[in-house]
Design a protein with these regions (language model features):
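Glycine-centered short loops/turns at secondary-structure junctions
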Residues: 72, 98, 179-181
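Cofactor-binding loop segments of dinucleotide-utilizing enzymes, especially the Rossmann-like FAD-
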Residues: 9-11, 80-83, 120-122, 131, ...
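Conserved phosphate-binding/catalytic loop of the ribokinase/pfkB sugar-kinase fold
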Residues: 102-107, 118-164
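Hydrophobic beta-strand scaffold residues
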Residues: 75, 101, 184-185, 242
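Glycine-rich phosphate/adenosyl-contacting loop at the front of the ribokinase-like
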Residues: 1-78, 88-89, 263, 268-270
Length: 272
């Protein structure tokens, strides 16, 4: 019996959330409704300008682990934070949420903990300004083989592919998990990330992973086609389990050649 159902690896980002007006966004030069990557000085200026801010541990894979933990599953997260106020907050929040944060905050690091300043407008639109900070340095030295071998599944975040050290960390975690009988997979995260690293993505999926999760745009991007069915078939040829989310069309799952299409129920949002 392994200790963890799922071990994830990804960007450890503190979400800093504040209500804001369109006037404020214009004054601060924030483009409404999109996510932008920003530098340290810009991050500090926006953080200081936020009023009544609320903080939460975030990051794509970390959020998934939080959901799994809420279902009662044992989870752990491989991430990198600095030993600063936000880093200590992040590590504590993950632990209190039921997910083991296996990497202690890094002392004397030259980059601060990653944060995403999220400005929520009255119409519900979110404007995100993300500074990656120390998360961009996550590498194989942060991967504990003993933790990986205690995982039934490891879950990788595609966003880390923009750094060579992130790719190396992926392979390290995947191989350690699979060598102990576990399974490894990835959430592709972003079609533009695939565009930048297509060959590496395909090599990882075919040779190092047991499952892949992506939306229709991400799956199509893997094989540079506008035909989703063609992309799904080709992905299924190199990976035994493919999960494709298709928005209002539902979810398509292909497991060892057998396909199931799961429909969605249409509802009216509570704030519509």
């Amino acid at each position: 019996m392994k200790k963890y159902k799922v071990v994830g690896i990804g960007n450890a980002v503190v979400d800093v959330i504040s209500q804001s007006s369109d006037t404020f966004l214009q004054r601060m030069g924030i483009e409404k409704g999109i996510m932008q990557l920003i530098e340290k000085e810009r991050a500090e200026a926006l953080y200081d300008a936020m009023e009544n801010r609320v903080q939460a541990a975030g990051g794509a894979v970390a959020n998934t682990l939080a959901g799994l933990g809420a279902l009662g599953l044992e989870t752990a997260f491989v991430g990198r934070v600095r030993d600063d106020a936000l880093g200590q907050f992040y590590a504590q929040a993950m632990q209190e949420g039921g997910t083991d944060f296996v990497n202690p905050p890094v002392q004397d690091a030259h980059l601060p903990t990653s944060r995403s300043m999220i400005f929520t407008s009255a119409d519900g639109e979110r404007s995100m300004n993300t500074y990656l900070g120390i998360s961009a340095e996550l590498g194989p030295e942060d991967v504990s083989s003993s933790v990986a071998k205690e995982a039934e599944y490891v879950f990788l975040e595609g966003y880390l592919f923009d750094k060579d050290k992130g790719k190396q960390a992926f392979v390290e975690l995947s191989r350690a998990c699979r060598s102990a009988g576990g399974k490894a997979g990835i959430a592709i995260s972003d079609p533009f990330c695939v565009e930048r690293h297509r060959a590496d993505f395909l090599n990882l999926i075919e040779h190092e992973l047991d499952y892949v999760i992506g939306n229709d745009a991400e799956i199509k991007s893997l094989f540079e086609t506008d035909d989703l069915e063609t992309a799904l078939a080709k992905t299924a040829e190199i990976c035994e389990l493919v999960v494709c989310t298709r928005g209002g069309e539902g979810v398509s799952v292909i497991a060892k050649g057998a396909r199931v299409d799961v429909p969605v129920d249409e509802i009216t949002p509570v704030d519509a």
